[in-house]
Amino acid sequence: MGEWAFLGSLLDAVQLQSPLVGRLWLVVMLIFRILVLATVGGAVFEDEQEEFVCNTLQPGCRQTCYDRAFPVSHYRFWLFHILLLSAPPVLFVVYSMHRAGKEAGGAEAAAQCAPGLPEAQCAPCALRARRARRCYLLSVALRLLAELTFLGGQALLYGFRVAPHFACAGPPCPHTVDCFVSRPTEKTVFVLFYFAVGLLSALLSVAELGHLLWKGRPRAGERDNRCNRAHEEAQKLLPPPPPPPPPPALPSRRPGPEPCAPPAYAHPAPASLRECGSGRGKASPATGRRDLAI
């Protein structure tokens, strides 16, 4: 029972990532398969070879007839079935633990690389969620494939009824030998019960796969919307950008001196000489006549 408890603890870790349908599948797996097979199946099928009796004393005939009647023991076939069904969920648990360890180791570095940037935090988170969802979808698909394969194998190998009588012919038996199976009715009931549990498990796997595919795209859209809203809120909380610097002022043109005005460094001229232009022209003839008179 220690092996069954260890397997149950591994499968129990899957429910952290599973929806409600996946948890129902886990209940069916733990109770109606592992528990029933560990407690009842071993007691029903443990003596099938010892109690397989043939009406001959020919050495090797009984073993050969038993091998032809049951190519693989029911009990071992179902054990192998449970192991293969448990492999995808256990691998997903190992992957989740590995990813959790890597994220815990690089959380501080990621926080230092992108402090206060929501888009840098939302994008890796969404990427990890998509990877985990794809891995879980793959595990459910592999589980469903294993379930259908073993249901078909059980129907082909054993059918749905354990016959109490088996007629065996061929070497090393000298003639047609009649062989008899112990407790055929009890074994038939158990075979039908296990096949029904397999059908229920397959239906739950199909429902879970459809649920994940149907709910995956809206959840991805909601996640993107949340990241966009967080980015917009962060942009609102940021301080306003500084105003742009004013353009450089153009150099102003200094007004030049008047055409008739003397420069600033010149001495002031006499009042009689301050007239210019036309006034100077009018005063010239009078001055000339005054000179001539002298």
Swiss-Prot record:
GO terms for molecular function: gap junction channel activity involved in AV node cell-bundle of His cell electrical coupling; monoatomic ion channel activity. The keyword Transmembrane helix applies. The keyword Membrane applies. GO terms for biological process: cell communication; cell-cell signaling; gap junction assembly; negative regulation of cardiac conduction; negative regulation of heart rate; response to glucose. The chain crosses the membrane at residues 25-45, 77-97, 137-157, 189-209. It is found in: Cell membrane; Cell junction, Gap junction. PROSITE patterns: CONNEXINS_2 (PS00408). GO terms for cellular component: cell surface; connexin complex; plasma membrane. It is a multi-pass membrane protein. Residues 46-76, 158-188 are extracellular. Residues 238-250 have a biased composition (Pro residues). Expressed in vascular smooth muscle cells. Found in heart, colon, and artery (at protein level). Found in cerebral cortex, heart, liver, lung, kidney, spleen and testis. Residues 1-24, 98-136, 210-294 are cytoplasmic. Gene3D superfamilies: Gap junction channel protein cysteine-rich domain. Keywords: Cell junction, Cell membrane, Gap junction, Membrane, Transmembrane, Transmembrane helix. Residues 233-294 are annotated as: Disordered. One gap junction consists of a cluster of closely packed pairs of transmembrane channels, the connexons, through which materials of low MW diffuse from one cell to a neighboring cell. A connexon is composed of a hexamer of connexins. Interacts with TJP1. Belongs to the connexin family. Delta-type subfamily. This is Gap junction delta-3 protein.
